[in-house]
Amino acid sequence: MAVDNDQQATRGDQLLTCWGASEGTAGMANQVRGVALALGVPLELHQTILKYPWRWFPPRFIPWKPEVFVDSAQFTGEPRLVISCGRQGAVASLAWKRQLKDRVFTVNIQDAKVSPDCFDLVCVPEHDDLRGPNVITTLGAVHHMSPARLAEARARGPVHGLERLGPGFVTVLIGGPTRLYAFSESDYQKFSEQLRSLVRAEKRLAILPSRRSDPRWVARLQQDFGRDQYVWDFVSPNPYCEALALGSHLVVTCDSVSMISEAAATEKPLYIAYLAERRAPRRLGQFHRAFEAAGIARPFDGTLAEWTYASPDPTAVVAAAIRDRLRAATVS
C-alpha cells in the first residue's frame, strides 16, 4: 500500500477517502493516480495480487472475497471511493463492493469482462465495445499527464541527459511487441530510416524506449542514434514527462493506446508510427482512426508539419462523471 502525498484535495473533497486498486504495473497505477489527481483527492494506492490459482481465472469465475488475495488484511478499511484498473484490481473492487455495499462507490477503468452493473461506474475508451447506462466512454485512455504536471516539467527544463539536445527536439516513444505487432527487423529498418530523415533535416531526437521494448530494438537504437541523439539507457532516471512537455513534435509507435493518449495531452503535433500487423487490429485501428479524424494525430512518414488541436483530456471527463454520480448517490 502506498499513499500519494502529492495529491491536493479540494475543500469539498477533503473528507473523501479514496483507495486505488491494481496489480501494481506502472501503467495501471498511473491511470488510477491520474483520475484521483483530476478529482483532487488524496489517494491510498493498494497493490491487489490474487493468490494462486485465482490469478489465472477470469474475474467472473473468482470469488469476490478478501481471502483470494495475497494480502487480505488491506480489506479491513472502509473507503468511500475505490478506483480500480486491470483484472486483479477489478476483483478487489468487487470484493470491497460485496463487503461495503452502498457505503462504497466503485469505479473501474478498462473492461473487466464482467457486467458493468457490478460497478457504480465503468470507464473505457470509445474504441472498446462496452456500453451501458453506467459506462463512460472517452476519446483515448485516462492517464496522469495533467496540464499542471506538464507545466511543472516545462518549468524544470531539460534534465537527465535531455540538456544535450537543445530546444525544439522531437520526442520519440517506443512501445514493444504485442499480439498485434511483432516489432520485427523490417519494422526497425523502416522506422530507423524515418528517424534518420529527421536527423538529416537537422532535428534532434529524444528516443525513449519502454520496459516493454524489444531488447534488440533498444540495442540498435543505442547503436544507431545514441552518440548524437538522446536514447534512454534504463539506468538514469527516465525523463518521460520532461520529454513530453518540452518536445516540439511527438512520434509514438502504434501499439500503445496509453502512450498515444498521454502524448495528446501536450496538444503538440502527434505522429503515430505504424508497424506491420500480425493480424488486423480492429479495436486499436478504431482508436487510431478516431485520433486522426479528430485532427489529433497523423501517420508518421519521416517528415514533420505543424498543427494544433485541443487535448481530449479523457481523465477530466471521467473525473467529472465520478463527481456527478457521487453527488447523486449522496443526495439519494
What are these model-derived regions, one by one?
Residues L208, H288-S332:
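Leloir-type glycosyltransferase catalytic cores
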Residues G168, P177-L208:
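Conserved catalytic-core segment of nucleotide-activated headgroup transferases in glycan assembly
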Residues G20-H143:
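Active-site and donor-binding regions of nucleotide-sugar-utilizing enzymes
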